[in-house]
Amino acid sequence: MKRVGLIGVIMAALLVISATPVMAGVSVKVSVNTTYPGELTVENFNLTPTYGRVPLTINITDVYLKNTNLTTPLSGTVYLYVNGQIKNNYYCSVTQTNNTTSWMSCGIEYTITDTSQTNISVGNKTDYLQNVTLTLWTTQLPESYVPQIPTLDLKDDGPISVDVLKIPSLKLSDDQVNVGETVTIEANWNYYAKEDGTRRIAVVSWADYRNIRSGATIDVATLLDKSKMTISLPEDGGSNSWDFTPTEPGYYVVVAFVDDTNFSDVLVFRATPTAAEKPTVSISVSKSVVALGDYIKVGASMSTDQAVKPIAVFITGANQTEVLCSYPEPGASTVGAWTVKEACGDDEWWIQIKDRPEGVYVAKIDVGEGELRAEATAVFQVVKPKILSLDVPSQHVKGQDLVITGTTNLAKSGTEDDSGSNAAENKAYLVIKDLSGKEVFNDTLSNQVYDSTGGKVKSNAVSLIDSDGSFKFKIDYFGKYFATETGFYIAEVKIQSDSLGEYTDTETATFEVVKPELKLIADKTTVTRGDTVTFTIDTNLKINSEVKFKIDDLAFCSGDPDCDVKEKTYYVDALGDVVIKLDVNTEAPLTDYKFTAEIPGLGISTDIRVSVVKQTLDISVDRTTVPRGGDIRVTGSSTADGVYIYASDSGVFTVGDTPVPDVDLKTKGSKINTTDVPYMEPDDNDNIDFQISVNVTGVETGTYYLYFYAPANISVVDKASDPQKIIAVTVTDPQIVEVTAPSKVPYQSKFEVSVLTDPGDRDNVEVRLVLSGPNVRDTTVADWASVDTNNYFNKTVDLRDIAKNKLNLDALEPGLYVLTAELRFKQSLGGEKVDSEDKLIEILGLTFEVDVNTPVVIGDEIVVNITTDRLEAGYDKIFVTLVGTNYKVTQVATLNSEGKATVTFETYGMSAGTYKVYVRDTMDTCSETDQYTWVDEHYMLDPASELAPMYKADDDVLVIKTIELLETAPTTTTVVTTTTAVTTTTVATTTTAVETTTTEAVTTTTEAQQGGGVPGFEAVFAIAGLLAVAYLLRRK
């Protein structure tokens, strides 16, 4: 790839810089004509070159003139000023046309030999353009550093291509912006395999970059660290743009790179201050509080748009000053520096804080002179080394590890904060003394004590300081070694912050060495044969410390592997505990047993007693009467390993999949065999909770006995010694508990039936409903179905559906019926009917009440109110037809839950006169599918007519009203109320259609019966049915 030697070029550029003229001084123009004073003025000029080696020849190439005389061209003389001093031998003569302003050629040449700051301007004999002064820096640069380009403007905004990175285009929106303005970076890139690296674009200040690039390589890690903005390009091709806003003046380099040798740093832009600005400086210290003897890091930085001198970095306070950097050296000739590192050789210093009093100190950077002077400070406090906390246990158990900790204000040992290097100077030291002052532990003794195996006892009397200022001492088995006597001791801790021991602090604490604690705990002190006892030896000993456990009588646990000898040695865990489990022998004598725990060598022991008693058994059942197929819940408690279940008969009960056997068949003498016998194991709290199922088939109703045993030996029940419990259980058939249904239901209506059962197991049974009555014999109205989770069977009985779909009738006659609920086992279990219950139901004749307002004034509504005893919300087979001269409208009346409906007719546009309202309930038996259309055509059809059976309209209810529609309101209003009680039968010979025409309030009640009364035979049947129902109810 192509690389530009940017470092050398920029160095020359920033040492020789020309500032663009700006209007920021006192004078804005200078007169250069004496004949017409003030009419010919110079207001600006151009200077070249703007860089070069000393000696440097400059040229005032042209000046900007203004002639305000309207008629006369004017001439004058322009003189050169250097550092505010006129150079009389350096001038040019100029002439400007009248009333014009323009640039005119001048051509003053002057050679600069001084390497210090030089101010160049032009003017007359007594004044010059201070406000357009140019600042020119020069230096003794080697010839090779002088760029071979027309100007020293290194700015480059592209576009460029970086072929090695497969970036066809990379450019900047501008090569010079003011601080706070935005530079946009635009890039187009092609595919670049990620295994070859990640392409990045970084924006970095020149002050940092000149130390990042060395020849043909760059330091990628430092570049990423110093980057002001870093962009990562994806593997696939693409394009994008990014904005960067410089916050400090200076040159910025845009570097595209993938590693230390594949990069491009051609793009450069400059950020200039919006006005003349002094340098930006900062200084920092590594910590705000530092102890005497420790080190502190001072870091300083400077950002500037021009080289600066002098530069000083120092620490001061308590009338003491320590200079870290002073630039330039006395007598040295220099133009200034751009960074602290350039001026001082470094920008970070590690300084040891010593030989100074406690107090607050200041680290300071001070740069520049006059109006360009800038400074910054950082404050830190110097304190004496101090132990901030000391944690010594008030009591220490003899033989345990002794741990002593604390904190200090010292830096971490072995860090630059400690010693300026990796040498560890900050340390803490421990000495332990008895009350007489004798040292029982120190740095020397810690290396001289050995245990019984010849190994050195681990301990430390010297501790390094951690990053949080903490220290730690640990002495293994203290009390067993070093201080072997119980009593009080003094721990003395000293800290030291330097290698010479000049800065120290000491703290002491008293603690007591005590004997260990020992407890022996049993989870049960009363046990049964076959039980398990858990013993816990609880100590405050160190892990792996030795304890002994003694069993007074091995008969307690004979057969247990941990019960082979009377005394055993154990070692404590990390909590200082030992856990021992012993199984009580199934034939252990019923007595007390003693157990002892001991710490060897210290004379510390404790004991506990455990009593062996008979097993316990406490059993209860949730019910003693249960249907076949039902379950009995057994709860209680037992100390036995298992509770075994027997019965007085085989084949009646089951536990899970195991049948409960006849106890007599398992008994031989006083022993009962437990093979193939169901049992339940108590939980960890000795509780039992299980179910015993009653079989469905092969079981007769009656009373049976259940036997429960809690044996000490699970292989055999000893009736003489093992606890037992006997419970009597009565087995019944599943039964119907209650049938809930209304005793009276409207004609052709729906009603709810609910059957509550005691099914035993609801999955075993099913229920159906059967209806009997006039012309109906054992008709199934609800097929066999299972009960729900609450043991209910719920069904909606639809009389209209039963008549039409099950009996092929138009309707069930009003009268008395018997609804029977039957309960049986499912067919898979034999289908045996086990219970039934009857419910007497009366189907009522339908009652109609129609109210119509009359007379009605045109403009008011005709309101038809219908009230029935049909409590079927949503029933919509009632039609209302309003008929008059050349007028007919039919509407549908829909009942609410109270059996009521209202229909209204608007009268606007109707003629005054007499109208009739026909209200028809088709009973939903009309033969026509479109009942609305049929009623609209046959609204007048009398249910008693010969044509009515053709349309199955002979069971209809028809009410006819006559109303008067008036032009104007009368003095009174007549309300017509008609109540029609309808008793219907399946054979209709007469139907009364009620027509009422009134001028007064009239109430008419008509019973329209579809037949000539109940025949004698049917009356006898009805009476016989009532007697039969009454008998059945008494039987239940």
UniProtKB/Swiss-Prot annotation:
One of its GO terms (cellular component) is membrane. Its main location: membrane. It is found in: Membrane. Keywords: Membrane, Signal, Transmembrane, Transmembrane helix. Residues 1-24 form the signal peptide. It comes from the Archaea. The chain crosses the membrane at residues 1011-1033. Pfam families: PGF-CTERM. It is a single-pass membrane protein. The keyword Metal-binding does not apply. The keyword Signal applies. This is Uncharacterized protein AF_0946.
